[in-house]
Amino acid sequence: MGRLFGTDGVRGVANLELTPKLAYQLGQAGAYVLTGETKHTPKILVGMDTRISGDMLEAALISGICSVGAQVVSLGVIPTPAIAYLTRQYDADAGVVISASHNPFEYNGIKFFNSNGYKLPDAIEDKIEEIIQNGGEDLPKPVGQNIGFKCYQENALEDYVNFVKGTITGDFEGIKVAIDCANGASFQAAPMALFDLKADVSVINNEPDGTNINSGCGSTHMRQLQAYVKEIKADIGFAFDGDADRVLAVDENGNIVDGDQIMAIIGLYLKDKGILSQNTIVATVMSNMGLDIMAKNKGLTIEKTKVGDRYVLEEMLNKGYMLGGEQSGHIIFLDHNTTGDGLLTAVQLLKVLKDSGKKLSELAGVMEILPQVLINAKVTNEKKYKYLDDEVIKKMCKELEDEFKGEGRVLIRPSGTEPLVRVMIEGKDKDIITRRAKELVRVIEGRLS
């Protein structure tokens, strides 16, 4: 059996890979590991996105948590970053999110936050996994009044929205904003926050039915929002993913403004105000080379990590940085929240837009994006890490790097949640790098499928 936890909790096809039994075991073992040392009745928050499997998995997860004597506070459908924030705000011992983020609706996932609102380190996940593999035989089995119970926190969403609004001063009166909620967890929170901040808000994909989350919409399918922004002549558009821990923007001309550009815009704004910690932005190896060029020209430093917001966060915590994130729109403002937060990011970008008086296209122009092609090679889960040892693949990558002569790069990495190897090639000529990426994908699929 491979490791249960991936890069972002436990994830799989609901009722096939992520079963109610596994959800129960995760609730049971997770609650025990995260609250075993407490001297009081442990309190654990549980929230979810809009997937049809959420109710099934929530029932099982909560049963597991209650079976070891913990109290569950059910928050219903709510963004992932809200759980991270509210776990701290409500003095809970842990928080749990039922979501598969940007994945299709048939997938779901379970991830934990500790009492400080941080995702769990590998060592804690390993303890949870060990208990599950051992069948949970040694776990406490409280009876009578010591069995856990569930209650509801009716104003949780409002508390989160008020927190996000409180991170800025002023309002967004006069700014026309289009938002795509991906039929996901932001469908109430995002409109509520922006309406309250007096923006002129138009919303699409805010009618979840359990199966339409991320379906042709949201931050992984931007075309609908791009067209909508131009159609209604909005100043800016925002597309969230299914659990709203990431966001991408669209400028007034319908062009995508990605996570790298958002960090560049906000980073420069904070630097100019003298409040960007060490004048540094933490990004990943997948960030566009244009971010590095911009930083060099503007007196910023870019620190690079492995792909994954957990690694970005780790670097930020270790070295005291306040701004970091990924090209995909996972952006962390560590002086406000402990994880990527799509709504918080949208509000911070709107603040820059309002204060600068500039159009988003002008702000985004501070960074020239080098053409970048990302193609997924479909491989087996068992073989997706073997590209590191494959001489043919290694030789082809070396030849491509030589061909680019320092004006491009090749990056290969396995997906943490799916049977894929992601091939990213960056360079000056889009046609050439697209052709080379397709050639490399064919080789990888031929050797690792």
From Swiss-Prot:
Mg(2+) binds at S101, D241, D243, D245. GO terms for molecular function: magnesium ion binding; phosphoglucosamine mutase activity; phosphomannomutase activity. Its cofactor is Mg(2+). It catalyses: alpha-D-glucosamine 1-phosphate = D-glucosamine 6-phosphate. Its EC number is 5.4.2.10. It is an enzyme of class 5 (isomerase). Keywords: Isomerase, Magnesium, Metal-binding, Phosphoprotein. SUPFAM superfamilies: Phosphoglucomutase, C-terminal domain, Phosphoglucomutase, first 3 domains. Activated by phosphorylation. Disulfide bonds: none annotated. The modification Phosphoserine is found at S101. GO terms for biological process: carbohydrate metabolic process; peptidoglycan biosynthetic process; UDP-N-acetylglucosamine biosynthetic process. The active site is at S101. Binds 1 Mg(2+) ion per subunit. InterPro entries: A-D-PHexomutase_a/b/a-I, A-D-PHexomutase_a/b/a-I/II/III, A-D-PHexomutase_a/b/a-II, A-D-PHexomutase_a/b/a-III, A-D-PHexomutase_C, A-D-PHexomutase_C_sf, A-D-PHexomutase_CS, Alpha-D-phosphohexomutase_SF. GO terms for cellular component: cytosol. It comes from the Bacteria. Belongs to the phosphohexose mutase family. Catalyzes the conversion of glucosamine-6-phosphate to glucosamine-1-phosphate. This is Phosphoglucosamine mutase. It comes from Ruminiclostridium cellulolyticum (strain ATCC 35319 / DSM 5812 / JCM 6584 / H10). The lineage of its organism: Bacteria, Bacillati, Bacillota, Clostridia, Eubacteriales. The gene is glmM.
